[in-house]
Amino acid sequence: DAREILQAMPADLVPGVLQQMDPKDAAAIVAGLQPALAAEWLQQMPPGPAGDILKYLGPSDTRRIVNRMDPVALGNAVHAMGPDGVSVLRDLEDQLLRDVLSSLPILVSSSIIELASSNEAADILERAHPATTAGILMNLSPVKAAEILELMNDHNAGAALADMSVSSAASIVQYMNVDPAAQILRRLP
């Protein structure tokens, strides 16, 4: 079958062949590979085609493969996926999620998080490094950042606020409801 033929080809040619295929067909092939090999091939592709293939993988196949990818290559593919990239981020193991978000320029990470619902964003940012979370939140609208902080656990939300300047934190907290704001501010040193 196609998978066996691709595996028999020189490894450096395979990513080029996959990106010329219909992404659905390429995803069907990639899903049947050993996760490490699939990850290797995807990260050798430009972000757009790699992201297109990731869109057509089922959640369990995506999880098996992306958790073995290089954080920078994965981050670029996730960014190229647009709104579909949010679900990939949500499914990453915690350490890889932190590595992906911190390896991308903060504006790129922010643009990915901006596409997420506030619940999805809170779920993702609770697991990110506090400094990364702070940087991302400061690049969102203060209203969206406030919504996300209210949905995060108090400890992680407080850690993110502690990594912001006083003026940045105040510009976000002013849009929060009183009770969640008080809970989070109690966590600050």
Which residue stretches match the model-derived regions?
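Hydrophobic packing positions in regular secondary-structure scaffolds
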Residues: 1-189
